[in-house]
Amino acid sequence: GMRIPSAIQLHKASKTLTLRYGEDSYDLPAEFLRVHSPSAEVQGHGNPVLQYGKLNVGLVGVEPAGQYALKLSFDDGHDSGLFTWDYLYELATRKDQLWADYLAELASAGKSRDPDESVVKLML
């Protein structure tokens, strides 16, 4: 069945979404959620579009979308991502691995988490 959290807390100041499943609690940073948003723009119709420069992004809204998902709104204007319960559980339980993968993708693409910084790749 669907893994629905027993509690959901949005901490705007720390830019964190906390999901509780029974005894287990997971803190998901807004940046992590933003770069893993399942929306059409981000997924690019089948080919995921690498999101970068989202270091400072915050969460401004969390609302249920029907019985099956959460709609997350971010302060960069992105609000079309519907995070299903199953996907949220995957993000929560696999956060460390997914984040490491994301950082590796950023590095190989020469992109930065910081929107004010561009990475100069030296071809030595």
Ranges and model annotations:
Residues 1-124:
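Motif-centric detector for short Cys/His coordination patterns
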